[in-house]
Amino acid sequence: MLAPRGATFLLLHLALQPWLGAGAQATPQVFDLLPSASQRLNPSVLQPILTDPTLNELYVISTFKLQSKSSATIFGLYSSADHSKYFEFTVMGRLNKAILRYLKNDGRIHLVVFNNLQLADGRRHRLLLRLTNLHRGAGSVELFLDCTRVDSIHNLPRAFSGLAQSPEAVELRTFQRKAHDSLEELKLVVRGSLIQVASLQDCFLQQSEPLATTNTGDFNRQFLGQMSQLNQLLGEVKDLLRQQVKETSFLRNTIAECQACGPLSFQSPTPNTLMPVVPAASPTPPVRRCDSNPCFRGVRCTDTRDGFQCGPCPEGYTGNGIVCSDVDECRYHPCYPGVRCVNLAPGFRCDACPVGFTGPMMQGVGISFAKTNKQVCTDIDECRNGACVLNSICINTLGSYRCGPCKPGYIGDQMRGCKMERNCRDPELNPCSVNAQCIEERQGDVTCVCGVGWAGDGYICGKDVDIDSYPDEELPCSARNCKKDNCKYVPNSGQEDADRDGIGDACDDDADGDGILNEQDNCVLTHNVDQRNSDKDIFGDACDNCRNVLNNDQKDTDGDGKGDACDDDMDGDGIKNILDNCQKVPNSDQEDRDGDGVGDACDSCPEVSNPNQSDVDNDLVGDSCDTNQDSDGDGHQDSTDNCPTVINSAQLDTDKDGIGDECDDDDDNDGIPDLVPPGPDNCRLVPNPAQEDSNSDGVGDICEADFDQDQVIDRIDVCPENAEVTLTDFRAYQTVVLDPEGDAQIDPNWVVLNQGMEIVQTMNSDPGLAVGYTAFNGVDFEGTFHVNTQTDDDYAGFIFGYQDSSSFYVVMWKQTEQTYWQATPFRAVAEPGIQLKAVKSKTGPGEHLRNSLWHTGDTSDQVRLLWKDSRNVGWKDKVSYRWFLQHRPQVGYIRVRFYEGSELVADSGVTIDTTMRGGRLGVFCFSQENIIWSNLKYRCNDTIPEDFQEFQTQNFDRLDK
């Protein structure tokens, strides 16, 4: 028997030689992550390990137990500064899932989902997570559970590439223990092979497919073949050793009973009793006793007068007590159908119930036990555990489940979820308040917006006298716009309240609460009882950004709290003003292509020398390079227009190829044409050559909820198809003075509030504009107009389609009839009421344009009156009005409406004019102080309104007659 056994171990040694050599080349480095471990890894060591460029593979091993259906984050790496995630592994017991979250190099979180895992079932589990290709190639993740690989995912973004470089920036957090939960082991392993790491959990991996190789050279095809042979060989060795043990035991007992081996022989009158047989001519032999251990191990031995007597074989064995052989209980099928039965010596064990079933562990000894105790596996009803999204149909099947469509009354799918069906056209499905407008969004979602003169969340709306989107009284809802307006009769969409006394600054006589009324206070919004003012400008030291330099404009270009008048680096680009070729525009590179001493970043003619930067027409193009040749009339001269013959005032060029989207056949340059085959592109602005569309709704997966991928969802994006415009913002604006010369020149004083959504003009000034820098094609523009004084009765309004100071549309409102006090160059008479004018001035800013704007009517080569409110009613002091403008320059459509409270008081109807084919937005004032433009909103919109078609039909019918 020694020769076969020796040969077996010799063969085993030879087979293990390659494996032993490989193991010697890559010894695993193990770091314990548990708080209680004496060798716990210091968090400061984590960052150098994980960002080591030579490390292309790592392992995380853990042993834990979670209560049934519970969820827990087993381990994670986080930013010490803002607690954002770098790496996190979470078990979601109720969903039978595990999720790996990690930070990609673009700063976004990537999710890897492992499905159909029973990790939270009250049992102890061993988990091994293997990450490969950390620094080279496409990443991959393998998950091993209880020594079996359960999932592998490849072609993933690399992990740890976005990890902070500072060692102190990484924080390790481990399992937060709850009652009946335990975390026995949590280790980080680097280097070494998968087999070596698995052995740390007493796992000898059995896999149905070759292990994934890595780029480190740990394994090769030859080694994998050897490992496969080694698996087979070890199984054979195990069976051989078990058989040899049985044979050795049998031989020992046979020799003990053999008559030829000595003077004694035994015969057994009964199966369990040995009696000596004495030959006739021989002397009486000695009687054998129990002290010679004649019985099988564990069998009771009893000495009798005639010899020894062995008891029955132990449970799980069969024989005469001297020789006992293991019983194979698996032949009696004690395990659930399909579950592997493992025969033990003695006894048997059943593997865990199949995926989709649950049941207790099954283990026993003996034929009787195997016959009378069968493993019970009960189907798991995944539909009770939230396997499908809420409010969807879930169909439970034996060992599995299937998710169906949304339940009746709900819409959506398994990707987006099932939400209660809402429909603006069906009164029973319309969730909005009776005082709200119901809007159907691109994805079929419904949004509720309180109507004019009402405020709230859209589902609940309350009265809003000043039309600033805040209700007069508190509403029973949680949205910001449900809070009570802190200035009931003065629009203040930002609800600013410097002294936090519950009264908004817009209506608080002492806004800073220092006991000094605003009119006498040199710091209206800053508490300063002493009113100290070192430089004698109009701002006290407490709020003056240049305490020792007179600067009434308080201009602070770089927003560093130091006014431009006393800041030696106004734009904060690190270059002193005296050396900076763009003092108010950051340009650390100081590039100056035309060598005129003005940097390209602020040069109105970057390729033509113009050191004086003269721009007479205020179109942001210097006179030296301004041709005023604009073939399509969109406000951009042909030499700089990215679509010279196609109207596109916005100049959007998504793929930055120099061709505007309006004339580009492939806006995102992904090889899929926008409109023609093999298009149309289901994500026109985001590259997606594969055109994935999981729910077949015609919108690609990558741009499903954010069409332009500007990180602002379409529902709140003011321009969902323009990544450069996301929110209404007039904080950056251009001032345009329309009468720049005069003896009593007073320019407007503009104050911007509420993050660019509210503008206030405080001076009784000459005509002027505050114009935003964003240009639009089609646009909807709305806002609240309010004159917060009882002084004066002149013009206020807004502009659109601004191309230069001689070309724009203006909507202006005069309170009373009045003749302009300067009759030169002509007598101008203003009538009360709302007027819509097209300005196309040959002279530009000056007395001709000034008087033409004042005059109600057409003026040659200056202004055309497109529409006037026939009511001839002027605006009222301290009353709020809401305007809505629609402009579609591609067809010349213009319509403007005015509301007083919730009542429509003026409507221009459809007006057609193509003088300006798009442009910028802004506000207008002429000799009127204390004007508020509040709750401003603009939205890109090229959709032609339905009433345009009706207008065309009526006009054609008129022509036919």
From Swiss-Prot:
Chain span(s) of sequence motif Cell attachment site: 562-564
Organism annotation: Bos taurus (Bovine)
The gene coding this protein: THBS4
Keyword Nucleotide-binding recorded: no
Name of protein: Thrombospondin-4
PROSITE patterns per UniProt: EGF_2, EGF_3, EGF_CA, TSP3, TSP_CTER
PANTHER family listed in its UniProt record: THROMBOSPONDIN, THROMBOSPONDIN-4
SMART domains: EGF, EGF_CA, TSPN
Residue ranges occupied by any Laminin G-like domain in the UniProt entry: 24-192
Region annotation Disordered: where it falls in the sequence: 581-671
GO biological process: behavioral response to pain; cell adhesion; positive regulation of cell division; regulation of tissue remodeling; response to endoplasmic reticulum stress; response to unfolded protein; tissue remodeling
Paired cysteines (S-S): 290-301, 295-310, 313-324, 330-341, 335-350, 353-377, 383-394, 388-403, 406-418, 424-438, 432-448, 450-461, 477-482, 487-507, 523-543, 546-566, 582-602, 605-625, 643-663, 683-703, 719-940
Highest taxon in the source lineage: Eukaryota
